[in-house]
Amino acid sequence: MDILVPNKPKYRSLCMCFHCHSAQASLDGGSSVKALVKRSKELGRRSATLTDHGQMGGLAELYEESMKAGLTPIHGVEIYLMSPWEPPKIYKNGKEEPATCHMTVLFKTQKAYEYFSSLTPIAHERALIKYGDMKPLLTWEELQEIGNEIVLGSGCYGSAVSKALKAGNPELAEQIYQQIRSIVSPESFFVEVMPHILDQKWIRPEYDKVSKEIIKSGMFVPNDLDECGSPIDLQKASNQFMVQMARKYKDPIVISEDAHVAVEDHKVVQDVRLGDNWRFSCSYSLEPTEVWADSLMKQMPDITSRDIEEWVDNSYKIFEQFRGYKFLTSKNRHLLPTMESVYNVSSDTSSVQHLKKLIVETGRFPKDPEKAVIYSERLKEEIRVLTQLGYDFLPYVFTVHDVCIAMRERGYLANPRGSGCSSLVLYLIGVSIIDPIEWKLPFSRFLNEGRVKGGSFPDIDLDISIREVCLDYLKAKYQDNMALISTDVAMRLKLTIREVERWMFGKVRSSTEDVLDDMPFVPQGVSDLHFLFGYEDESTGEHVQGFLESGSQAAEKLKNYIETEKEIWEVVLACSGIPKTRGVHAGGVVITPVPIQSIIPLTKVNDQLATAYTMKWVEYVGGVKFDFLGVKTLESLSHSFKAIQENLGVVFD
């Protein structure tokens, strides 16, 4: 009996992807961090890497997903460097714009992570906006400063070396190469060879009308043609030069995928996200070594199988440099403001002592002996839960108290909503106007021992009549220790259908608009798939009817669209839920005992700095969210109270 033996791969798997982008940062990423980690695992790799363009917002998620998958997370960033080797571009109006180049940086230590995170505010202040994407800029000197803590790659087609080569100056290209490799130790510099056939880097929207129509139909126009009209592989010359330099200076070479999608099928998501900004002409996905070996050996006929094996082996050498990397999360720390930063008190004063002082000053503790016993027992239990279960949550309470009192002193209404009103502590120090004992509200609605042991923090939503005043107060008080929290603005169902049609046809067809006009919007907090097909309610276990099950005329229209436009619908499902842009959390801010950018990278959203991590990942790395919500109804009430006081002499507490 013949035994079938599966074909053994010619090459072992790459240990890691040296250069990888996600949909979490710039528009040219087409896959989620989770999908990239999953693909790395499928390919038999030992690690997952993320080096988004100028952004670090996906690094916490990469760490979590990698740990769950049993992979080593490798953090990094592809920086936009203000090139010291090129003159600035000068426009007709006299405005100067610095020349930029790309460089791949991997963090060997937590110190490197914190260093690049700390530079995110200034990098975003210098940022260029190009074709809808932001390019935060760093300087050569800032890169040199951290050389001992990083692994450095020679970069992609947008690197300084490749740009000098493209400009026809190989001498300058070699000088730049020498300078770059000198920043780090020899074992921490790797020459990147890109296994892509790059017949064009991208298509820009300013091309003529004919080119635009070709782009919209999914085809591509080569930027460069040889004499016979065949596309020139722009990457080929760069790779050949890099290999030449590596051999001359005895530097290790690594196959650098520059992945922008996990699998080739995700490229359509990348295209839809980019819209008319530009379109990659080939798929930058994570692939088996054999695929890249074939590509590189076709590009460079002098490359042998032994070269490929050596380059694969180098990926394992890189991996070894990250075994000791430690990334701090909420398992290691909780970054609450200190009591001393909230109030002008001595560090010798305990949080419980200061709480009792506030209670006395507020004067809400009952003087009746019988009531005092009841209140004392409840207060004792609340203090136990807040301070004696492994955490001291009173600095969180004090921060909210300080904001609440400051807003009221300035003439603005402020009061907690929801479960926070179940806390006697909040009532006794003057934050809440609701006496939870009088209204029979149990403290367990707000916080209990089980929740604390499960890792939950107290969550006080403070409603304020004018949020901007509150934010100004927080910025003045905490300065770099406070930041807004960003949100992902995902591609939801209606938007996704429109974006996909614009990508495929250059416009949204009128028949499709007719379908969309009758569709309700997906409710907040409900996924597109749950909205369409229904879901099981977690609290009741009952099936919640989906829109397509409703039998309405609008639902039947959408059903017909799905049946007749199957190709479009597949793309819609692939894109749905992928971030399209960034927003700012309606109420959330994070306040820490140290400058935020040293632990949480920042980004620019609508011309204001906010955390590059969304709320889930801010809390994952130990940040604590405070909710200060602007409520227009309170502003209206405030005006009403003032009018009543002025006209009737009635004063409200």
Task: State each model region's role.
Residues 2-653:
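Alpha-helical scaffold/interaction cores of sigma-54-like transcription cofactors
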